[in-house]
């Protein structure tokens, strides 16, 4: 799995109830044809990334088929989750 691009938006907390900053990432994912996640239309990953003081984490995510926006029922493997977390840390500024 390779991340080839992204869109990011900082989410606003209108009531100030949540600590830290939240970002919504739409990651463009390149997947090998042999991978069960592969789709001819392409695959994306929506991520809610939270940065709170020294703690960065992925709050939620899901894979989707680009074009149809159909949600795909897959989970990130541990190494992939680290890759996504690192990517979000590096690209969080809008």
Residue spans for each PLM region:
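Short amphipathic beta-strand and strand-loop transition segments with alternating hydrophobic
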Residues: 1-17
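Generic alpha-helix detector with strongest preference for long hydrophobic helices that associate
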Residues: 4, 8, 30, 61, ...
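Beta-strand elements of well-folded, non-transmembrane domains
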Residues: 7, 12, 29-33, 49-53, ...
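Short, solvent-exposed beta-strand/turn "edge" segments of beta-rich domains on protein surfaces
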Residues: 12-22, 35-38
